[in-house]
Amino acid sequence: MSAPAGSSHPAASARIPPKFGGAAVSGAAAPAGPGAGPAPHQQNGPAQNQMQVPSGYGLHHQNYIAPSGHYSQGPGKMTSLPLDTQCGDYYSALYTVPTQNVTPNTVNQQPGAQQLYSRGPPAPHIVGSTLGSFQGAASSASHLHTSASQPYSSFVNHYNSPAMYSASSSVASQGFPSTCGHYAMSTVSNAAYPSVSYPSLPAGDTYGQMFTSQNAPTVRPVKDNSFSGQNTAISHPSPLPPLPSQQHHQQQSLSGYSTLTWSSPGLPSTQDNLIRNHTGSLAVANNNPTITVADSLSCPVMQNVQPPKSSPVVSTVLSGSSGSSSTRTPPTANHPVEPVTSVTQPSELLQQKGVQYGEYVNNQASSAPTPLSSTSDDEEEEEEDEEAGVDSSSTTSSASPMPNSYDALEGGSYPDMLSSSASSPAPDPAPEPDPASAPAPASAPAPVVPQPSKMAKPFGYGYPTLQPGYQNATAPLISGVQPSNPVYSGFQQYPQQYPGVNQLSSSIGGLSLQSSPQPESLRPVNLTQERNILPMTPVWAPVPNLNADLKKLNCSPDSFRCTLTNIPQTQALLNKAKLPLGLLLHPFRDLTQLPVITSNTIVRCRSCRTYINPFVSFIDQRRWKCNLCYRVNDVPEEFMYNPLTRSYGEPHKRPEVQNSTVEFIASSDYMLRPPQPAVYLFVLDVSHNAVEAGYLTILCQSLLENLDKLPGDSRTRIGFMTFDSTIHFYNLQEGLSQPQMLIVSDIDDVFLPTPDSLLVNLYESKELIKDLLNALPNMFTNTRETHSALGPALQAAFKLMSPTGGRVSVFQTQLPSLGAGLLQSREDPNQRSSTKVVQHLGPATDFYKKLALDCSGQQTAVDLFLLSSQYSDLASLACMSKYSAGCIYYYPSFHYTHNPSQAEKLQKDLKRYLTRKIGFEAVMRIRCTKGLSMHTFHGNFFVRSTDLLSLANINPDAGFAVQLSIEESLTDTSLVCFQTALLYTSSKGERRIRVHTLCLPVVSSLADVYAGVDVQAAICLLANMAVDRSVSSSLSDARDALVNAVVDSLSAYGSTVSNLQHSALMAPSSLKLFPLYVLALLKQKAFRTGTSTRLDDRVYAMCQIKSQPLVHLMKMIHPNLYRIDRLTDEGAVHVNDRIVPQPPLQKLSAEKLTREGAFLMDCGSVFYIWVGKGCDNNFIEDVLGYTNFASIPQKMTHLPELDTLSSERARSFITWLRDSRPLSPILHIVKDESPAKAEFFQHLIEDRTEAAFSYYEFLLHVQQQICK
């Protein structure tokens, strides 16, 4: 249910302990200009035809209660809610599939006929009380194939006696609450025939642009103790615009960028103050259509194909370890910066800071807010005119106006406020701005000014009818398929000619399994009785309940994943379920196959700018209906030709419509300036502490080995800086006989001594670069400098990189002690085991955050390598990478000789870091079906506007999360879609757009919502929310909220869905692992209490949670345990002519360990091999290379390569695990009864420790809270 803009609904609470929640964001997006029209007032949804809506989907069940007021609960327990249609509706309903070709009918042809989609006043919003609104999302996944999850058989061995796991009163003090790249080279220039090539380069450098939904964020009421899901605000000197009236505030919400707030007695006001910061980027246009299949070994094979006219290029790229990269293009003073729509802020929030970052929202920010954006009324209209001047499909025509901001490049507007239709003639494009007079990008843009929205013309205005002569090759109508657009009567006389995805709607009824009592995911599980809850095989992502053909077309969960694979119809239904709603994304991951499309035309919706995808509906050959805003768009002439089949007139068979993940080679329309070269700057700590650690030797050797593998082209540039108490620059200009060191000792006023010779061409100055790398490790051997001027060194790096942008790699070994950004030690070693307050999780100064935002504005990302044995205040230093879209690498107790395992890890990590794909000047936007909105983002980036994430760099190891809310009822549609678009510049200088599209069903039954829970995605989203809560509130609040997430969801299930005995702790099969994963999260370094944890270690764990993809994060939260002393070939898999054993998973409990065995624990970044005291000597000799248990050394970090079957199996299995992750894990071999085993046993999360519950005790605690 949606509430009127600006209205507030205080959330009711079921218990006093904190709940997860988030500031919801509502509103529509900004208009794109007169060239786009509003959505049709008719049945919404890609699959919605004039069909009877089955029970369970689309319509409320007769017992379904949709309260019109606020949802509240009693103070002591969960309110018993009426039972929805339960499991029967999960399979009994028909999901109407998006129709690629729908035969129109004559509905609503009479004058004055009522439109099916007239929007009445929104119903009041229902705010959940216990968990709060789990509104958010992120997507990231770990498996290349979306296969249906197989029901795992649980070995039900009931506990003989609860006394074995009795929870004593002493546990109350344990921290738990006692109460609750390819180039499409055509053989001829501007050839009319596309060339088909099959190069072997991996599909690297494919980062695209991702843009969030156009809905304006509205802050929802949250409890004092709920996860607010806010983003950090940053202050700026200039004041915010005055608060508009409530009426104007509602009007502004339609623009998609106004900030709405709520207030509730006793609750602090909260806001999502989303600000824009415009910078530029550019792409190389490729007008020569080609089809390329790239692979990393073979050369291109050109093959001419003869189409009737010039056509787009589609290429499938096989990605390998190293992909093609490309240069990025930051803004320059010669290129304009696009204005943005305004952000309106209420007066009560004027004390908040004005910059949002996708990780933390800090409501205690300074009281001088200033949005980082520059806009005016005139500029906003100019932006709208620019978008209106672009056709429904972006083309490379020189008549297109030159966009002057990323927001204008990608486009972002919702159909409600658009004034003209897709088929009406586009207005003349706005004159191209003069680059010479364009303003330079500013790091701190001017305040935003409210802009009144424009009136929209009626939907369908100006659409011409279909030409009567277009009836060739008519096909018989498909029975049962009704038109999805009854308003358009102009082409109703023409039959359907081409089948498509939409035709599947007539067969979706086959999904009904009414003969089955319930799906496996809804099978009730008694958690306290079912002891072996963990399956023996890995947990796969659940497959959405869609037609088989739609499942094949859907996006891989490795790239795009939702916490709920069945989307609730209303926010009230989501509140009842007490589950988080959000997306997890891994948008730039390495792909083995990626369709790369080079075309003069990138087909996009004129209203919401969605890229055409497999879930759109083709009304006829000339029109397609957007699956996000339901706007009808024209099909461009070029799109009629399919280069793969060499056929004409079948747009629904184009690769863009057959693949949910595609990459476009973008035209000049997506550029703000020419692509810049790839620029790499290394800033190195050379103080005494750094020289003593010995990292310079490893770094310089790795650079020498991988210098030729750095992503880039012939223009690639590189530079070096070192620092201690002074800053050292290195002149590597071609022509010098040796490198020249230039020392700047005035760290209070840093300047560049020779700006033109500090960043040099990699290939022209390669010999000088090699000389420097060979000399650096020994240059500072006898240094006595103990101080570190990191802040001034970063200021100098910013000045050096500003003209082009690029990547700065910073290596730091101690606490900064001189100049700007100096820090003091804040850690008290005596408080590392505290069960009470954990302090200093946030930064001590805003210096690094402000500098990071300046870097982001100049398209520069900062990656931090922290190699320190002492406290270095990572909480403060990490801001440099968080807000500039960089990465953080942490090597505690690093020493070249004393800690060889860390030294080896650094060497392997550097090889991956230096050679992996990279994208420059990236922006990312996520769009979603109308009615859904995004309100909180998690990851390393800067939020430039309400839905546009600025990524100075993008890499294949970065993950993101987004929280979602349901702003409007989804009763008019049976499917919802999400689309992420990542626009970036490859290291080869190509502008590319990688697009992922995910389709999910909508359900109206609470049982169906539970049936579609993706428990791993949910726990990863909760982990991101808990990090925010730890920083903005306290660690104890975050822990309480995690516990309440379990209590509330299981309580809601028991009171609304489950009909079994209420004395037992019941959960649906889809949620049976939820309590286990939450307990594992509570025992993770980021959130554990009562166990000695260094502050930097805790902060680094939180940074990993916020930036890792789901597949790697889950291993960090819940490690995998295998027995490896009995490996066999049974069930083994074959990988590259290698047989890899697949041992079953073991529960993380000491009861599974035997002294006669050996066990491998995979914790993501570290492997442990625990060897029992009575382990078979044959295994010890054949695998470890020692005669018996006693002869195994205390510190062993390698498995020897022995010519035995057992050794081959063990090494093959460990190598297979290592190959599945980007960074190399450290291997520790731990002997039973050795001191090192304590670290291993800390990961046995099902066992009790001095400061935490066992799994069974935790279940009893949850059950006790539910029964209160």
Swiss-Prot record:
Zn(2+) binds at residues 605, 608, 626, 629. Residues 376-389 have a biased composition (Acidic residues). It is found in: Cytoplasmic vesicle, COPII-coated vesicle membrane; Endoplasmic reticulum membrane; Cytoplasm, Cytosol. Gelsolin-like repeats lie at residues 1141-1213. One of its GO terms (biological process) is neural tube closure. Residues 1-14, 21-48, 245-255, 311-332, 365-375 have a biased composition (Low complexity). Keywords: Acetylation, Cytoplasm, Cytoplasmic vesicle, Endoplasmic reticulum, ER-Golgi transport, Membrane, Metal-binding, Phosphoprotein, Protein transport, Transport, Zinc. GO terms for cellular component: COPII vesicle coat; cytosol; endoplasmic reticulum exit site; endoplasmic reticulum membrane; ER to Golgi transport vesicle membrane. The keyword Glycoprotein does not apply. The modification Phosphoserine is found at residue 1224. Residues 1-71, 216-263, 303-345, 362-451 are annotated as: Disordered. InterPro entries: ADF-H/Gelsolin-like_dom_sf, Gelsolin-like_dom, Gelsolin-like_dom_sf, Sec23/24_helical_dom, Sec23/24_helical_dom_sf, Sec23/24_trunk_dom, Sec23_24_beta_S, SEC23_SEC24_subfamily. Residues 605-629 are annotated as: Zinc finger-like. The modification Phosphothreonine is found at residue 329. The keyword Zinc applies. Residues 426-450 have a biased composition (Pro residues). COPII is composed of at least five proteins: the Sec23/24 complex, the Sec13/31 complex and SAR1. Interacts with STING1; promoting STING1 translocation to COPII vesicles in a STEEP1-dependent manner. Interacts with RNF139. Interacts with TMED2 and TMED10. Interacts with CNIH4. Belongs to the SEC23/SEC24 family. SEC24 subfamily. Component of the coat protein complex II (COPII) which promotes the formation of transport vesicles from the endoplasmic reticulum (ER). The coat has two main functions, the physical deformation of the endoplasmic reticulum membrane into vesicles and the selection of cargo molecules for their transport to the Golgi complex. Plays a central role in cargo selection within the COPII complex and together with SEC24A may have a different specificity compared to SEC24C and SEC24D. May package preferentially cargos with cytoplasmic DxE or LxxLE motifs and may also recognize conformational epitopes. This is Protein transport protein Sec24B. It comes from Homo sapiens (Human). The lineage of its organism: Eukaryota, Metazoa, Chordata, Craniata, Vertebrata. The gene is SEC24B.
